[in-house]
Amino acid sequence: MPANGNSHAYFNIDEVRSKNVLKQITQLINEVTNITETFPLKPGQTTEGLVATLDAAVANFLQTGSFAISKCPIANSDPRAIDLLHEALGAVQDTGQVMIQTGRDFVRDSTSTNKRAIATNSGRNLLTAVAKFLILADSIDVKVIVDKVDEVRETAHQMIEADTKIKVDDLYNLLISQIEELDITVRRRAIDLVKPNQRDDLLAARSALRQTAPLLYTSTRTFVRHPEHEEARRNRDYTADEMHSALNALESVLNGQQPKVTFSEYGRIGDLINEIDTFQNRIEIDPAHYRRGTDRPDLEGHCERIVSGSASIADAESTRENRKQKIVAECNNLRQALQELLTEYEKSTGRRDDNDDIPLGIAEVHKRTKDLRRHLRRAIVDHISDAFLDTRTPLILLIEAAKEGHEENTRYRSKMFQEHANEIVSVARLSCQLSSDVESVSVIQHTAAQLEKLAPQVAQAAILLCHQPTSKTAQENMETYKNAWFDKVRLLTTALDNITTLDDFLAVSEAHIVEDCERGIKGITANASTPDENAANCETVDCAAGSIRGRALRVCDVVDAEMDFLQNSEYTETVKQAVRILKTQRVDQFAERASALANRQEAHGLTWDPKTKEEEMNEFINACTLVHDAVKDIRHALLMNRSMNDVDSDVEYEADGVGAANADANRTISEQENQQNLMRRLPEEEKKKIQAQIDIFKVTQTRFEREVAKWDETGNDIISLANNMCKIMMSMTEFTRGCGPLKTTMDVIRAAQEISLNGSKLNALARQIGEESADSQTKKDLLAYLSQITLYCQQLNICSKVKADVTQVGNELVVSALDSAMSLIQTARNLLTAVVQTVKAAYIASTKFRRPNANSVRVEWRMAPPKKQPLIRPQKNNAIIRRASERRPLQPAKVLAEFTRNEIETGRDSDDEELDRRHQQRINGRL
């Protein structure tokens, strides 16, 4: 805020990093501007009273400031800072007195321009002085925290340099006490920070500090006990570097600087998902504005970048061959659909007549993009499912080998563990390419980076344990690294679950169970002429059975976690019951039968004849079917609470449930039967044709939203009527797909009648606007569009009598309603287009060509206000199926965290007492 006149001081509001400081500055700004600005006085309020209020506020500020300076914790250690505070407070006092005097002079003669300017200048000087004092006080608070960081750094350095275990233990106890003391102030500071990214970075550094302390302790003790081993030194150096990095990050964020590595910098949306979103937004171009020289290269460039990013996922190691082929096919389909759309754009250049070719081309590109998204998502879920199938066994096998003291086996297991770690890190990073959830992406990328650095140290700890298998210190060190690894893997798994849709996960799990079953069948039917070959076949069957069991239990864990966050209902109980059946019955039955089969193969596999192999193969298939059917039952239970629009599958139309299409097939269908259900039973070919028309209607709907929804309905009946007509037409088109609020033919007829009524009102109002406007081409266009609305409303009334024709062929009912459904959708689209053109023409006629002597304005053309934004920005998820976590109630842990924050904000005195108590304990301990 600059100061004018004699004022030469400036302060930048962006320099304020504390919410409390910002709040106090804002409050004082309101007090001062109440005097210097024109505003209505409240009943009983006087201008002299405002000056008195300001005087009291300044006096209270000076008193509070003096008390705070007297209690400043650095009063003895840094007298220079205290002097600066006194000087800043003195400036507040001086400028406050001047402001009160000039303010009093101004309110007594408020018509004086000179006195107003002097009062305004004095107010700015006072605000600048107060802001400088508060910013200085805040910087001293930061210095106090930084001093605590330096204490922790010094203690950590002493512990690293310690040469006895007793010193290490004593210094570690002191370090933990200092970290706990620092943690209280850091949490308080994090809540008070204005910028969210600084708050996230500070909390991430705090978390890293707390997690690194136990590793530093065990690594240092191990190095003191076994200094002759290079692995011990590497562990200690790693933890020392991590400790220093965390402390440096804390200090940088506290000082308002950018740390070398921050948590917030990982929150970047992947290039591929960004390209797909941009591409879908760019393909819808007004044909009149299409330019071949710029639009074609731009769209083709976006398409090729999408294809390139998709190819990197398709070529990844764990991508299934069939999924790869689908991705390649969809990329080619997307290219072809884009070229056809661009060709239609170029054909329409200079042509005024509208046709369905461009909307149909846009709908086709959207459909191909949607299909490509689905295949890419499920390819990534393939990777996640394989990499995170068993995250514990590689490390457990490594530790067991190390405890046995077998170096060769330990190094082999270490290599396998490192490969496993590299796989989960690469899969985690790959998954971020298709997620727009910034928070989850930040957690995934940050945790993956930590795991990448931690994995070699876990291997070093295991090799050290292999060299000293009886050392208690080495065992404790290994245990600490193991716990740290599992904690971070658990966090990474949770974050990946947050960006994975349940439908994708279950669909992929079903497919993987089938793959594992086929792998087991190959192990059963493979020929074995030697014991080694038979053992290899047995291992194949055993691994396949273990994978199936692991995938089934993983399904149970994921679905149970989702249901735990939903309120109890019949739906959740149905899903939980399906999970219980899989977990407590089917998995155990499968494990028992698979184990018995493996034992039989191990004992008699060399003597199996083809008939025996076929019997054992059927036994394995039946056992796998138990698990596969149970997983499918869980998926069906989850879909019971979904509408058709929520299901993103290879088939656009889904049956209501098992047996829904055949239920009561032989009964006679009456006139009053729910026609919506009959529309769902249309032949697939008719459904596809109807869906193509609906896709075109959605393109027109998008144009409607872009042209009409930007206007405010308040005071504009044209916009209100148009929006209402659009909503009803959407319901009518949904009826042709067998969903939506309209159930019977009578519902559709009533909806058409309501559209006709709204169309008549719109026609009358727009015609009056046209009559009041000057003669122009716009007036002629408006009247022409109104005649189209009348025509299409009449056609819609006729088409609304859509009814499914039912004929019986043998024992099956054949439903057909293609012609009437197609006519209904096409008429609704034409009507919607006419409404859009009418709104545009009415706006131009009423604002640009209105006659000067016309009556009062019939409608008010105002831009719609921005939609209300939630206090907490919701996470954006491009997936079709939303995870239950996005509609779940507030988690108990989150409620507790909010309670803790409030307690920190309101209970500062208790924190201060706790800090004083810890400080006194440290002093007594040193004495």
Swiss-Prot record:
InterPro entries: Alpha-catenin/vinculin-like_sf (IPR036723), Alpha_catenin (IPR001033), Vinculin/catenin (IPR006077)
Cellular localization per UniProt: Cell junction, Adherens junction; Cytoplasm
Tissue: Epidermal cells.
A molecular function GO annotation: actin filament binding
Record's GO cellular component terms: adherens junction; apical junction complex; catenin complex; cytoplasm
Keywords from the named record: Cell adhesion, Cell junction, Coiled coil, Cytoplasm, Developmental protein
Region feature (Disordered): 901-927
Coiled-coil residue windows: 319-354, 672-696
Domain of life: Eukaryota
Main subcellular localisation: other
Reported phenotype of the disruption mutant: Worms arrest their elongation at the 1.25X to 1.5X stage.
Biological processes annotated in GO: cell migration; cell migration involved in gastrulation; cell-cell adhesion; cell-cell adhesion mediated by cadherin; cortical actin cytoskeleton organization; embryonic body morphogenesis; regulation of actin cytoskeleton organization; regulation of protein localization
Complexes and interactors: Component of a core catenin-cadherin complex consisting of hmr-1, hmp-1 and hmp-2; the complex localizes to adherens junctions. May interact with hmp-2.
Family: Belongs to the vinculin/alpha-catenin family.
Function: Required for cell migration during body enclosure and cell shape changes during body elongation. Required for proper localization of other junctional components, such as pac-1.
Protein name per the record: Alpha-catenin-like protein hmp-1
Underlying gene: hmp-1
